[in-house]
Regions:
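Conserved Lys-Pro-Asp/Glu-containing loop-to-beta segment of HAD-superfamily phosphomonoesterases
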Residues: 402-423, 429
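Serine-esterase "nucleophile elbow" of acetyl-processing enzymes
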Residues: 82-142
Length: 673
């Protein structure tokens, strides 16, 4: 519909009622202007759900008047839906425009795309998903079919680009397998060695993270099911190869499960023979959003943007019915009804998330006692009260409850995922807390689990002991909070805790956990530099620098490995510069930062370091530590838009500042700092 102007426009607009249809017609009649934006917002106020194409149109209107951050937010809301590849084509120009203008990104990174098939339709989708995930990405697209040349040519475009992350796009045709391979083990070993050589070259050249796909399967097999059982059968060889890829991949290489993506899309939609023959397009265009989403889940994990908390509603989400109206016998969960079984399957999935370290929380409009009743007395509930790190059941709005929950858990809201059957509640949380990931689950309980899983919100590249113990740690933290409340002062509380600290070298044993902290810690993080495992290890191995990891415990249990501090040597031999100083927010207010400072000064005295330079690089999340160096006795020596620099003259005799933490490093057998 063409827009109109002047008296004719006014006449049209004056005739339109203030209804959903009237508001939509206004959006079609108005040209780009603030009035058009207001018309879109009025239209959205009538809607329980929002169509991605309407959100895209509103985003364009906002961008046209220079409201780029607001435009990006509307586009992010559109991209949070399950959109088809045609949507990305419509949004492409706007995505690239906003990518260069928005400043609300959480991370910046350089991503290289190297493919054996055509990637020019894939890259715009990746760019859009980066915008959705608040990643300021500069993307380099290698030439078609030139993976080897890009990796091994010292003068290639990749070498000039110097990526942080390299995405490799390969598929079953690259294996050049016949229906049957004579010696499958020899062939697999040779192929793996070629991949490992490429990985080493990339790692040595760029210190980057590599995202390598496992291999998908041909849509047609002449041998049928025999291809998976015969020695050397193509399906069997691909199965074994994919297993070896996962086993052989080093820490800085993650393997994308292409077989899972192929299953998600469906083999018949995954491949388009005509598109391959004509354009060397693989997978098919309609499969590209799912294909790109699989890779982006790894990017988020590498950058520390995976979600940590699943917050769920109760009525018609964890069970069928309303507990306050239907009572314990009236709600449905478990055997007895299809809906009840669907809710039980969702609970079991959530319980598995909890076992792998994801925190579970409840946010429900309910009376507190009613909300707890099914967890205490219903025989078929898979989840129990002990499985939740936070439980909020009241009549306050859910956005306010989520904010309070974030404060209580000491976690930022961009680590939250929100699950609710009520579309109005979902829209309210989206509008008030855009950083929270809201699952667009629909209204049928048979879709809840699938939609939650498809979001890949909790993707992780490794599973550490600290992850598995996370839920227990938060339960113990509740006991500490109770002790704090009963203590007459902070000193009294810290004394009762009986805190102990340990300092240890960064080795292959703890490298994964240290790297995880480097890429996930936001609040107590002086520089917020993000490094690969290889980079962290290289810093730790510098004989002229100093890098240590820190553990903490008290009378109630261990906090685990919760901090890292590393210094780089400066040109002159008696000067260190603090490269990274970070600490888990779970230990705030326990003097752990002072314990780390004390160990740093001890090491500096031992190494005859005269001065230590501290650097504070402000971000949207680390304002907590903006005055930290001042508090620790450093003096300000310089300031720019990007950072503030401090210096400390190392005292001849160290003074203990962490008076409430006992250093048990020696008794634990760790290396002297």
């Amino acid at each position: 519909m063409e827009s109109v102007s002047g008296p004719r426009q006014k006449a049209w607009l004056d005739c339109l009622p203030d209804t959903p249809n009237g508001a939509w017609l206004r959006t079609q009649l108005l040209a780009d202007s603030p009035a058009l934006v207001l018309s879109w917002e009025r239209f959205f106020s009538f809607q329980a759900g929002r169509d991605p194409l309407d959100l895209l149109a509103c985003s364009r209107a906002l961008a046209a008047i220079g409201a780029y951050e607001e435009a990006a937010q509307k586009l992010r809301l559109a991209l949070a839906h399950d959109v088809r590849h045609t949507f990305f084509s419509r949004a492409e120009k706007l995505v690239y425009r906003l990518a260069g203008l928005v400043r609300s990104n959480l991370r910046q990174c350089k991503i290289a795309v190297l493919g054996s098939s055509t990637t020019n339709l894939l890259v715009p989708i990746l760019q859009a998903l980066c915008l959705r995930d608040r990643i300021g990405a500069e993307i380099y697209e290698g030439s078609y079919g030139s993976i080897k040349q890009e990796i091994w040519d010292a003068n290639s475009g990749l070498a000039r680009f110097r990526p942080d992350i390299v995405m490799l796009f390969m598929h079953w045709r690259d294996l050049h397998l016949g229906a049957v391979t004579d010696d499958e083990e020899v062939w697999i070993s040779q192929f793996i060695e070629e991949r490992k050589a490429d990985w080493r070259r990339l790692s040595d050249s760029f210190d980057c993270h590599i995202i390598q796909p496992s291999f998908d399967y041909p849509a047609s097999e002449a041998y049928g099911h025999l291809a998976s059982v015969l020695h050397g059968g193509r399906t069997r060889v691909i199965d074994l190869l994919n297993l070896r890829l996962r086993e052989e991949a080093p820490a800085n290489v993650s393997i994308v499960d292409m077989a899972a993506a192929q299953r998600e899309v469906g083999t018949l939609r995954w491949e388009n023979e005509l598109a391959w023959i004509r354009y060397r397009q693989h997978p098919a265009m309609e499969a590209l959003p799912e294909f790109a989403a699989a890779y982006m889940s790894h990017v988020r994990s590498v950058l520390g943007l995976s979600r940590k908390v699943l917050v769920t509603d109760l009525d018609n989400t964890l069970w069928h019915g309303v507990i306050g109206e239907d009572g314990l016998d009236g709600i449905g969960v478990g055997p007895g009804s299809p809906e009840g079984e669907a809710h039980l399957h969702l609970q079991r999935y959530m319980l598995d998330l909890k076992y792998r370290g994801i925190l579970l929380a409840v946010c429900s409009k309910n009376d507190f006692e009613d909300a707890q009743l099914p967890f205490l007395r219903h025989p078929h509930m898979a989840l129990r009260l002990k499985d939740f790190a936070a439980f909020r059941a009241n009549w306050e709005d859910k956005a306010a409850n989520l904010r309070a929950m974030g404060h209580d858990l000491s976690l930022s809201l961009d680590s939250f995922v929100f699950l609710d059957d009520n579309s109005l509640e979902r829209e309210w949380v989206r509008s008030q807390l855009p950083e929270v990931a809201v699952v667009e689950q629909g209204s049928s309980p048979f879709h809840y689990l699938r939609q939650l899983d498809r979001g890949r919100y909790f993707e992780s590249l490794s599973l550490l002991g600290e992850d598995l113990a996370r839920a227990d740690q938060y339960r113990v933290e509740a006991k500490r909070t109770s002790l704090r409340t009963s203590s007459c002062s902070l000193d009294d509380f810290l004394q009762k805790l009986q805190l102990e600290g340990t300092v240890e070298e960064i080795t292959e044993k703890n490298l994964a956990r240290v790297t995880q902290l480097v890429n996930k810690t936001n609040q107590f993080n002086l520089t917020t530099r993000r490094y690969t495992a290889a980079h962290v290890y290289a810093i730790a191995q510098d004989p002229n620098g100093w890098a240590r990891a820190f553990q903490m415990s008290d009378r109630m249990g261990s906090y685990g490995l919760i901090g890292m501090l590393c210094c780089r040597p400066v040109d002159r031999g008696d000067l260190w510069e603090i490269d990274t100083w970070l600490m888990s927010c779970r230990t705030l207010g326990r003097q752990m930062e002072k314990f780390m400072f004390d160990r740093l000064v001890e090491a500096a005295v031992d190494r005859r370091i005269g001065r230590i330079v501290g650097v504070y690089r402000p971000t949207a999340k680390n304002g907590l530590v903006k005055d930290f160096y001042d508090q620790m006795g450093f003096r300000r020596v310089g300031e720019s838009d990007d950072e503030v620099r401090f210096e400390l003259d190392v005292p001849a005799t160290p003074v203990v500042t962490a008076t409430h933490i006992r250093n048990v490093t020696a008794s634990a057998g760790a290396v002297r700092p």
